[in-house]
């Protein structure tokens, strides 16, 4: 079980925490890195809404899954991962004032969902997650005309691995996305037009 915290100080930007969160909610997908897609619903990021997302994995595989908006107020919102996501847990996006400067923050509480994702975390997933949220915060800060470093901290809260949850592999979104892509490539080729029959 891990807690990861990423934050960026919006030094020099005359913007309140509430204004940062309002923009972040409205343009959430636009702040994501270019290789990831977040399909924001028309009604906005409101509690109870399920949002679809696509992320590029190593090997040019695309993971398709979703998150549910668990909570939202003027200065924060929280999403919870759907079944089959690499990590079970939630992400909280918030903004607050610190020493007269508005700070934007992403905090994750996460545990690998199955043994395959446990192995992926060691191999590459932690680094991917770090790059993703650092880039997201850089993009958010750039919207307000700020270039600043992202400070981040990773804390391991529980060293135990839940091997008893091996059955969750059945719901693994990366495996299912890969099988869907493979089936689409190897499936029967459909003609683009109906051939003309001669009599």
Spell out what each predicted region is.
Residues 53, 77-80, 104-106:
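Short hydrophobic/aromatic-rich beta-strand segments that constitute the beta-sheet cores
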Residues 83-128:
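Beta-strand/loop substructures that line and gate deep hydrophobic ligand-binding cavities in soluble
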Residues 107-112, 143-173, 199:
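Compositionally biased, charge-rich terminal segments
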